[in-house]
């Protein structure tokens, strides 16, 4: 009888809430209670909630070895999303180094006219958001440029800001490079491109309605107040650092084609990275990525590029392409979030309590 395995019991409602309360408490401590401490990330509160959840599970009769096995089993189901996020870092770096994103921005800014500033600006923010996979990056970079252009046209800053945020978030949600898009697909245990396609039915009509309204409002803008120097300075900065060509948009087209064909995420991104890397070696100066030596190419994909143009907006965009190294913060957060919210609570049945 001594070798019989102890039967675990179901935790009470209050006991099941302990890990959640602990996580909230540690987050409040880090973000509000002791802001002078210098730690403002969510990682350690999640780690502490995992520790508390393990203690609660052990108190209810679960063996630590069984809990660990349960975590590993459930974590393996999410590894594809984590691997995709790693390769997304390669994709962002290769797109930037190849000149794909700079070319996209340069040609997009050519489309700006006073009457179409609002709808075209929204579309450009969506495109840039898709290309770089970050609504915040889009808002903080080209979005700031559009605020300056909008001010020159005499447009209400709140309206311009709404246009920027609308486009940036639409682009972020449709982007296979976005960390939140990958996280949503991982939590839902669905394919990345399936998740992106599923959002078209809800986000697509919303974008169309917004563009119609922006077009109507744009027709009332005074075209004589338009100052093209802000957009021109960004274009000149990119042209000075990169070779700009329509051909360099091909890597971005490859991603779109992979999404339409519903190619598995890892395969589609790998093909796009290979395409962009080849274009980088053919078209761009070695000043951008060091040399054609394999080590420098690996360095670019891992850590990104360090190009400076002298233009604040352009440099901010370029600075976001940090390669795989730039995705590690998000990957760590995703793993800890999955462990604390799913992989601990499910094996110990804490998630079943209501």
Task: Show which residues each predicted segment covers.
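Residue-level detector of conserved catalytic or cofactor/ligand-binding positions
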Residues: 342-353
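Alpha-helical transmembrane segments in multi-pass membrane proteins
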Residues: 45, 49, 53, 57, ...
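Juxtamembrane and boundary regions of transmembrane helices in multi-pass small-molecule transporters
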Residues: 33, 173-176, 181-236, 247
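Short juxtamembrane and helix-loop transition motifs at transmembrane-helix boundaries
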Residues: 4-9, 96-106, 124-127, 224-238
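Hydrophobic transmembrane alpha-helices that form the pore/transport pathway of multi-pass ion
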Residues: 111-201, 354
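Juxtamembrane/transmembrane-helix interface segments of polytopic membrane transporters
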Residues: 93, 214-218, 222, 276, ...
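Hydrophobic transmembrane alpha-helices of multi-pass solute/ion transporters
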Residues: 3-87, 97-116, 254-336
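Core mid-bundle transmembrane helix pairs that form the ion/substrate translocation pathway
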Residues: 224-260, 270
């Amino acid at each position: 009888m001594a070798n019989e395995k102890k039967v675990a019991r179901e935790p009470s409602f209050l006991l099941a809430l302990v890990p959640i309360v602990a996580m909230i408490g540690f987050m409040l401590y880090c973000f509000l209670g002791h802001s002078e401490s210098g730690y403002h990330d969510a990682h350690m509160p999640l780690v502490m909630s995992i520790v508390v959840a393990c203690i609660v599970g052990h108190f209810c009769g679960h063996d630590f070895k069984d809990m660990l096995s349960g975590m590993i089993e459930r974590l393996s189901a999410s590894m594809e999303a984590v691997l995709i996020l790693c390769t997304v870092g390669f994709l962002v770096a290769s797109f930037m180094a190849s000149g794909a994103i700079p070319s996209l921005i340069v040609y997009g800014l050519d489309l700006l006219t006073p009457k179409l500033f609002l709808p075209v600006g929204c579309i450009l923010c969506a495109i840039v958001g898709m290309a770089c996979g970050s609504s915040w990056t889009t808002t903080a970079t080209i979005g700031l440029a559009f605020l300056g252009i909008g001010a020159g046209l005499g447009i209400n800053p709140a309206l311009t800001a709404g246009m920027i945020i609308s486009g940036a978030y639409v682009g972020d949600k449709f982007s296979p490079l976005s960390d939140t898009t990958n996280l949503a697909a991982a939590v839902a245990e669905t394919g990345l491109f399936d998740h992106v396609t599923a959002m078209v039915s809800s986000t697509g009509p919303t974008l169309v309605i917004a563009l119609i309204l922006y077009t109507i409002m744009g027709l009332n803008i005074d075209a004589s107040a338009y100052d093209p120097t802000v957009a021109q300075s960004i274009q000149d900065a990119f042209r000075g650092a990169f070779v700009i060509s329509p051909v360099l948009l091909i890597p971005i087209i490859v991603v779109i084609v992979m999404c339409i064909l519903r190619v598995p995420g890892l395969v589609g991104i790998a093909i796009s990275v290979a395409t962009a890397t080849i274009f980088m070696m053919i078209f761009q100066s070695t000043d951008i990525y060091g040399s054609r030596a394999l080590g420098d190419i690996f360095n670019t994909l891992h850590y990104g590029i360090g190009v400076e143009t002298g233009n604040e907006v352009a440099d901010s965009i370029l600075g976001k392409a940090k390669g795989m190294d730039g995705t590690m913060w998000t990957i760590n957060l995703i793993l800890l979030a999955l462990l604390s919210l799913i992989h601990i609570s499910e094996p110990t049945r804490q998630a079943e309590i209501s």
